[in-house]
Each structure stands twice: as structure tokens, then as C-alpha cells.
């Protein structure tokens, strides 16, 4: 629809990759900016036996396929791959909990989304599992999902994202304070909110340079443009309309807040097609290796 009407879409959430539209600017993480780094961290920290669980639609299928590839590269094993409805309730996770008990994986990789996320984490807690030994690791469990669960259910689990509400940089703190000042002190500030924020700035700057709201002119100005976002300086890759981002991994503490456990301080060039699906290839932008 966007292309047929010569429009322009900004997409602020992570996604499964393998897509391109010249009429879309992708500001969320591509798989080589979150999945790859998360796989490396989990394999080196917890072990190589994974159980995959996701919501029943395209993103989890593709995300789990990529994670399985990375795990196999790390000489790991996929013990099971299970899917639940998009609006899954406690009963939908009974089989998942049963399989976890039977297989005892080192890591549970979750691509469960939305309100079902808290149901999974609460079921995990009720089963008495120990996140210090067998965490749930995710790309889709953000501050927004954590806000819907008890802190005790969140504690110890892992998420990879380019931005966390607790990011310590001055720019991040200023952004979070402004966000909560507008939407309330309890409003969660996930990576998608940060991406939505900086993409508006990129769009308005491109619009000003173009001097017109014609999408073609704005697109021309957007490609290769940069902005000092809360996560770090981001850039639109002119090759694929995706964004150079700063990967991070965090663990949830007893208060249900993310605490960074891995931050290489490098900006990663987007590779939405995962041309090189290797645990050793980060596509690092060597010009930007400043810790944020």
C-alpha cells in the first residue's frame, strides 16, 4: 500500500529481516544487530542446549530459524521448538513447561510477544525454575512487557536490544526523563520508543533539507543521514534503508529493571539479509567504537 501510493513508512520495531522497500526506513534492529550477539553471549555464558518457544506467526518462525542456525554453528543443540497462540493463556503454556522440565535446556529462547509474554514468565516462575541456571532469553521482552508482570517473575532473564530504559549515557537519561515527564513516571521506555523518537528527528531534518514533503525528495535526503540518538549516533544505510545501531544485552534485576551485562560500544552495520550468517561476523562500523 505504501509503495502503490508513493508514500513513506518509518518502521521502529525489530523484525525478522529479509525485507527491503525503497519506501520504508527501518529503524529497529535487524537480526545481525541483536540475534547474533545474543546467541554468542548465551552460548558462552549458559551453555549450548536451547529450547525455542514463540507466538504462532511469521516473526517467531524466522527469528527461531536464525537462532537455531547460530546455535548449531556454536555446536549446540535445539531440544524442541514450540508455538503458542498470539493471545496465549496459562493453559497454552502447560506443554511448554512440561517440555522444559523433561529436556532441561541451558537456555529458553522466547519469541513470544505481547500480553502472552507475562503469562510465560509467570508460568516459568510457578514451575520453580532457576533463571541463574536456565534463563529465558528474548528479543521481544522489553520494558513494556516487563511492566505487565511481577518483578519476581522477570528477575534474572535476558533481553538483547540497542536501547534500554536504564542506559546510563547522558543522552539516554535525558530522553527517558523527558518521556516519563510527558507520559507519566511509570511509563515504560522500550527500544521501539527510542527508535520512534530518533526517526522523527531524521524525518524532519530530511524534510527541511528537501524543502518539500514529496516522498522521493525526503527519501533522497534520508539516505546516509545521521543523528545523535539516545543509544548513540545512528545512521541510515543507503544500501538497504536500515539503520546502523548499537547492540546491548541486559539482565532483569529484582526490581524488574534491565541492567546491562554486555555492551561492546560499537555501532553495527545492518545486514537484513544475513548474507554472512556467522557468529564471527558483526559487520562492525569501525568508525564508531565509542562506548555509550
Label each residue range with its predicted role:
Residues 3-25:
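Flexible loop/hinge segments that line or gate small-molecule binding clefts
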Residues 4-6, 20, 74, 132, ...:
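Short, structured coil segments at secondary-structure junctions
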